[in-house]
Every structure is written in C-alpha cells, then in structure tokens.
Amino acid sequence: MIIPRFIRRMFRSPYDGMRHFAAVEEGVLYRCGQPTPEQLDELISRLNLKTVISLRGRRRADDPDGWEEQEASVCRRRGVEFISIPFNHKNPPTREQVGQFLAVMRDAKRRPVLLHCRVGQQRTGVFCALFRVHIQNVSPEQALQEMDALGFDVRHRRHQRLLEAYRRFAADAQALQPSS
C-alpha cells in the first residue's frame, strides 16, 4: 500500500531525519547521532534538556563544518551545559571519562541529558550500556545485548577495543562509584 506523502507528513515523528534517536530513559537520558543545530534547538525545547554530551573527537577532519562550535553555541544560547568527552574506536574511553559521564547521570539537576556521537551507535552505545549497568542496575550481559540490538555489532573487528572497554568498565562497579 502506498501512503501519500502529505499523509506521511501528518504522522511524522519530530525526530525524523535524526540518526538513531531514542529515549534510554524518558526524561533522563536520550541518545542520537550528531544533531544539526536546528535539531538540537528543537530537542532542547521538546525535551527540556539540561546537558548535551558529545562523544566526538576534536580533530579538524572530524569537524569539517564546525559542528562542535555550532553545537556549543546553541547550548550557550539556550542555557544548556555542553560537555565534550572525546574518544573513538582506536582510543576507547578512559576510566576518568566514564566516571565523568556517570557523575553527570547521577546528578538530577543536570538531567535530562542528550548523549551523542557522529552516528549514535558505537560510542553512544557503549555509554548508554554503562548507564544501564551502573545507574539502572541492568546486568552487563543484558546491556550488551541491547547495545548490539541497537546497532553496535559486537562481531565487527573495528569495535573490539570499545567492546573490551565496555566489559572492563561494566565489571568495575567499585571504581566507578562516586567518591564520598
């Protein structure tokens, strides 16, 4: 059955065109690929975002259009905290980076949070799975299955360092607890 374009537009999600957008926990954590400045502005309004966390790197090649400055500018204008926690498949996240992310997620005043990388699957998937394990008390295996189902692809050779980092940090609950 072919649905006319004007009818499809009537039922379009406000997040159409945004890569891999999903609520990890409604009102707490949302995930996606790199939003445009317009999409980010819309998300801030619709979701009442308090913090945006980018997991993208700062290399010039990774930012040909100045996405980071545009994103930071939208956040500044809207009074939203912008945090950059850059890592990639060759250089997985450090304990400090994971701890920084989890500290934000434990602070109710800094939520809701939008978490993204370029595509919204690998880097974002690792941090969302760690959120599920350390904040929502989901088993590491269940979080890994969810991460894979949402596009991580645990079998892909390129993702093995990220997968090893996930397993290490998922098992290391003691080290990632907030300091008293």
Which ranges hold each PLM region?
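Short cysteine clusters
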Residues: 117
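Substrate/cofactor-recognition hotspot
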Residues: 120
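Cys-dependent protein tyrosine phosphatase-like superfamily
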Residues: 1-114, 126-180
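Glycine/aspartate-rich loop-and-adjacent alpha/beta segment that forms the canonical ThDP
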Residues: 123
